[in-house]
């Protein structure tokens, strides 16, 4: 099947077949990343603008690398260097950028739904690199790819997601993707960080304790506390949080012995993950980062409608 979307804004907007296509393409893209010369002419002549209104290390860098490895011209713009600091609106910024004829705009923005707003008004493709607490589709895809690498499948696996569910766009993309692919998703976190009606996000089980969520889990995805989105303190302190919802060698034993431990980054060591676990044999955090480049190459490729050229 072909990929028929101009934009990639949320995994919930995609079908199971489309998610499988993106993951399959990412698997093929990894061969390029293993070469001595990591470049193919697939997107030669295309222009990609990475427009980031929020800070980012992994996502922005990997989107830039992904574009360059496909031979696209990439331009990076951050909020601090844009006219947003002078009061320019998002739409005016986007319209001015579109006047320069880019093919794809990859954007991260603090406002949920901002990508839908632009997609209706711009002719170029829009890829969501994270919008508020709404979604982070590339993170969801790379999480699924990383798990598929290990188990060869996603259906039937027990996936525990632990932490600040309310403010996490990663949680929403993971829930959408994993439930669509047949995984069993279990959620745990402080009641103040569990959104009302979370069951509406997908076929999930909300657990009263962390132990219930990670008991016999195949995969544990730990989320950081999104303090920049909370506006107020939702936990007494990080030490108390870590006591009940931090992953350490002792409570990791509740999961399966070979359970995968994952984290979207940045990690707050000693809060959601102990250093022993973050650096241990169960950790797949760096594999997630590695797969992020291939996944973002696949996303750029499919929204461009190009034909893969590998020579």
Swiss-Prot record:
One of its GO terms (cellular component) is cytosol. Carbamoyl phosphate binds at residues 58-59, 108, 136, 139, 265-266. The keyword Transferase applies. Pathway: Pyrimidine metabolism; UMP biosynthesis via de novo pathway; (S)-dihydroorotate from bicarbonate: step 2/3. It catalyses: carbamoyl phosphate + L-aspartate = N-carbamoyl-L-aspartate + phosphate + H(+). The keyword Transferase applies. L-aspartate binds at residues 86, 169, 224. One of its GO terms (molecular function) is amino acid binding. GO terms for biological process: 'de novo' pyrimidine nucleobase biosynthetic process; 'de novo' UMP biosynthetic process; amino acid metabolic process. Its EC number is 2.1.3.2. Keywords: Pyrimidine biosynthesis, Transferase. Gene3D superfamilies: Aspartate/ornithine carbamoyltransferase. PROSITE patterns: CARBAMOYLTRANSFERASE. Heterododecamer (2C3:3R2) of six catalytic PyrB chains organized as two trimers (C3), and six regulatory PyrI chains organized as three dimers (R2). Catalyzes the condensation of carbamoyl phosphate and aspartate to form carbamoyl aspartate and inorganic phosphate, the committed step in the de novo pyrimidine nucleotide biosynthesis pathway. PANTHER family: ASPARTATE CARBAMOYLTRANSFERASE (PTHR45753:SF6), ORNITHINE CARBAMOYLTRANSFERASE, MITOCHONDRIAL (PTHR45753). Belongs to the aspartate/ornithine carbamoyltransferase superfamily. ATCase family. HAMAP family: Asp_carb_tr. This is Aspartate carbamoyltransferase catalytic subunit. It comes from Geobacter metallireducens (strain ATCC 53774 / DSM 7210 / GS-15). The lineage of its organism: Bacteria, Pseudomonadati, Thermodesulfobacteriota, Desulfuromonadia, Geobacterales. The gene is pyrB.
